């Protein structure tokens, strides 16, 4: 009986060790686990009565930096770090600086994702559910409902995993000294 219990304990230990073995992770889970930086072009669709479509470039770097540069239909830059969000709207000559109350930066979302049976990844942060879909081993689309219950779908193209990105690009530096800076 003792020998049986010892063998059983060894088998249980091995099964737990195997379950924790990183080699059992899917390719997508490996990408998320080792993601330190991300760069991609994006198409953002806000689905409401009249869908709005935006195009731009995202650059993000761990632990929590992100730069969203909207190019069409209006130019806008969004700088995020662990403390604040800066929204720069060059057409309005204005930058709005808001303290970041909730950890909803790009990397916090990615780190909390859990694989679903359909192969997508989901997480819920502050009553917002995020769903990420991979294509060809890279993040392809991110969906969530915004504060006004509109479905937002961001589709990534030309995605790069762990590119070299300089920290300086995540710091807002006014390009024009005549802009208004609004602190909220």
Curated annotation (Swiss-Prot):
Gene Ontology biological process terms from the UniProt entry: lipoprotein transport
Keyword Protein transport listed: yes
GO cellular component terms, A-Z: periplasmic space
Highest taxon above the source species: Bacteria
Keywords carried by this UniProt record: Chaperone, Periplasm, Protein transport, Signal, Transport
Protein transport among keywords: yes
Signal peptide range in chain numbering: 1-19
Subcellular compartments: Periplasm
Chief location bin: periplasm
InterPro entries xref list: LolA/LolB/LppX, OM_lipoprot_carrier_LolA-like, OM_lipoprot_carrier_LolA_Pbac
Alphabetized Pfam families for the sequence: LolA
Cited function: Participates in the translocation of lipoproteins from the inner membrane to the outer membrane. Only forms a complex with a lipoprotein if the residue after the N-terminal Cys is not an aspartate (The Asp acts as a targeting signal to indicate that the lipoprotein should stay in the inner membrane).
Classification via PANTHER family: OUTER-MEMBRANE LIPOPROTEIN CARRIER PROTEIN
Description of how the protein assembles with itself and partners: Monomer.
Record family assignment: Belongs to the LolA family.
Full protein name: Outer-membrane lipoprotein carrier protein
